[in-house]
Design a protein with these regions (language model features):
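Beta/alpha (TIM)-barrel catalytic core signal, keyed to glycine-rich beta->alpha loops juxtaposed to Asp/Glu
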Residues: 1-171
Length: 171
């Protein structure tokens, strides 16, 4: 969001679009927690979502309060770049390799080895009910992404991937 964004103007535009029946609900993208709260304070209706970057290699939203705020407000965050822009598949990067091994350790007993499916399943297993945004229009990739719903992560499984990404155990 622009540092000069006027929340009254944004709220007015949202209200007008809703009044005219052009939209039912609104969400925002890449709003840090303070800006999200500030905009929400001007709106008559609650925001539906905040679309943010997150993946097993990009944990900021889990650590900066973004996902915590979504849980508190009972909204489902959307996540862009759920495969870290392809970095998840980098076999030369130590962090990517650790994360891939942790994901496959969870997926193997369930018959799943594909990193894209496992990364999406990991995101969706979070208590915030994260909705990954899959940037592909390729039908085969979309079918694979849909298969992520069948892969289950326990809390311990989820934390094992998070810890692999951080490079140390989670206290």
């Amino acid at each position: 969001p622009s540092p000069c964004a006027n929340p009254e103007e944004i709220a007015g535009a949202f209200d007008e679009l809703r009044r005219r029946g052009l939209v039912r609900r609104f969400g925002v993208s890449n709003f840090p927690v303070p800006k999200f709260r500030m905009l929400q304070s001007y709106l008559a209706e609650p925001l539906l979502t905040n679309q943010v970057e997150a993946s097993p290699l990009h944990l900021n939203a889990f650590d900066d309060g973004t996902i915590d705020l979504a849980l508190r407000m009972r909204i489902r965050p959307m996540v862009w770049s759920p495969l870290a822009g392809g970095r998840l598949f980098d076999t030369q990067d130590a962090r990517s390799v650790r994360v891939a091994e942790a994901l496959r350790a969870v997926g193997a007993p369930q018959g799943e080895e594909r990193l894209d499916v496992l990364a999406l399943a990991w995101l969706m297993a979070h208590p915030a009910s994260i909705m990954p945004v899959v940037g592909s229009g390729n039908p085969a990739r979309l079918r694979a992404a849909a298969e992520a719903v069948r892969v289950k992560f326990s809390e311990a499984d989820w934390i094992s991937v998070y810890a692999a990404s951080q490079g140390h155990e989670v206290p």
